[in-house]
Each structure stands twice: as C-alpha cells, then as structure tokens.
C-alpha cells in the first residue's frame, strides 16, 4: 500500500510558507521530475490498492520548494542578470551564496532539517529540464550532503548552501 501524501510535500509562497501536502491544485509549482514522481505515485497508489493490496512500496519522503520560492529568490536578490550572463560559474555561484532565501520559507526549512539526520540529495526539478523537444536533463547539479553534524545550526546552514549551489548550477 502506498500513501503518497505522506511522502510528497510542497513548500510555496503562493499558499503561504507552510508544509502542505502536494495536490493537483499545486502542480504548477512543481518542476518536471517532481510532477513525474507525483503522477507515478498517484498511479501506483490506485493500482496497488486495487490489484495488489498486500504489496508495500516505500517511497522516500520528498519536499519540493515550489517555483514561486525560486522566483522570489531570484527577484528579491536581483540575480537574473548575473544568472544569465557569461560570467564564470564561480562568480555566479558566489552571488547565489551571498543571496538570501525568502524569509517566509526559512522556518519551514529549519523545521525539516531539525527533524532529519539522514543523508539528503538536493536536486533541481526545473521546468527547463523537461522540455520534450530540448531536454536539459543533467544540466543542474545534484548536491549530496551527509546531514550528520551534531549541531542543528550547522546542518541547516549546509542545507541552505546546498539549495543555493544547485540553483546556481547550469
């Protein structure tokens, strides 16, 4: 049995900075990979419940920062010009690291990190990565973090740095 809503959460600015269960109403906030996982999870949930009720599939917990969070990050820090420039990657990454994430989501992100002490994969689910005619798969980096530091402040800082690192990659 699969209960997808226990495993897929969406953080967005449009519906307030809170952990919400992903639903069809929030799918415009999801990039391609997240939408794909959500869709596959829904199909599996329906099939498994009807045809294979005794089989259990474990889906890792996943939290998605909606596109509105990324858009606010870019706009509030005026990063569009530098992000789309021909500057060296190191300069772009440095600008992203100096920028602030939207304050509305920091508390929610902090509570996630406080509750997790397992390794994390921070990945992009950008809309451009999934254009059918010109896929950008693999353009954005994945950042793996051990998330095993004893100090929650250090774990949170490493997590935020990783989010910015992935967003800066291109």
Give short role names for the model-derived ranges.
Residues 1-170:
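N-terminal beta-alpha lobe that positions the nucleotide/phosphoryl donor
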């Amino acid at each position: 049995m699969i209960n997808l809503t226990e495993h897929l959460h969406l953080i967005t600015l449009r519906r307030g900075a809170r952990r919400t269960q992903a639903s069809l109403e929030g799918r415009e906030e999801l990039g391609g990979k997240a939408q794909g996982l959500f869709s596959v999870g829904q199909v599996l949930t329906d099939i498994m419940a009807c045809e294979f009720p005794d089989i259990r599939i474990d889906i890792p917990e996943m939290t998605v920062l909606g596109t509105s969070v990324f858009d606010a990050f870019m706009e509030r820090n005026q990063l569009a010009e530098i992000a789309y420039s021909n500057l060296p990657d190191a300069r772009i990454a440095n600008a992203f690291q100096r920028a602030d994430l939207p304050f509305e989501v920091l508390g929610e992100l902090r509570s996630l990190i406080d509750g997790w002490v397992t390794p994390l994969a921070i990945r992009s689910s950008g809309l451009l990565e999934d254009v059918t005619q010109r896929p950008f798969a693999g353009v954005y980096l994945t950042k793996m973090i051990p998330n095993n530091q004893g100090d929650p402040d250090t774990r949170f800082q490493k997590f935020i740095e990783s989010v910015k690192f992935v967003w800066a990659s291109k």
